[in-house]
Amino acid sequence: MVGRLARLRDSIAHTGVPMKTVEDENFHITLRFIGEVSEPVAAEIGERLASIRFERFRIELRGLGAFPRPDRPRVVWVGVGGGAGELRRIRDEVERILTSMGFSPEKQEFHPHVTLARIKGARNLPALVKLLREMGDVEVGSVEVSSIRLKQSILTRQGPIYKTLYEVKAASSGRV
């Protein structure tokens, strides 16, 4: 799956639009961005996430899209088709846990996706918009979801480094 996402990302990069692409090892689906928190709060979040129960399931990655919209792309992504409902259910559990801890409710609607690139300029933008139109229904493939993870994002000049703090596995719970 990573190879397919990488080839799609590379096709986007070949449009010549200034962008920052996501490295292969950083492809992921964000259920909820939390922001900066202390280590004790992160530990409490991890412990509470352990209450989430789910079975392994598959998600279908399909459709190239962009935020805020395809004709004004700032973030280019691959969407989730099949399995999106189960992702939403898990995300709702995460949201319930966070709001019970005093975090503000997420204002934006949840659109499960894998980010491929962040657009940094307008040069050659029509080529990217055309590609987004042509690949709006592209089928990338399916992947099994077997865990959810609380990640720390460490920002560097070379790009983010993601470190797993806690992991909840399907059909059981616990942290790693």
UniProtKB/Swiss-Prot annotation:
A motif (HXTX 2) lies at residues 113-116. It is an enzyme of class 3 (hydrolase). A motif (HXTX 1) lies at residues 28-31. Keywords: Hydrolase. It catalyses: a 3'-end 2',3'-cyclophospho-ribonucleotide-RNA + H2O = a 3'-end 2'-phospho-ribonucleotide-RNA + H(+). One of its GO terms (molecular function) is 2',3'-cyclic-nucleotide 3'-phosphodiesterase activity. InterPro entries: Cyclic_Pdiesterase (IPR009097), Phosphoesterase_HXTX (IPR014051), RNA_CPDase (IPR004175). The keyword Hydrolase applies. Hydrolyzes RNA 2',3'-cyclic phosphodiester to an RNA 2'-phosphomonoester. This is RNA 2',3'-cyclic phosphodiesterase. It comes from Aeropyrum pernix (strain ATCC 700893 / DSM 11879 / JCM 9820 / NBRC 100138 / K1).
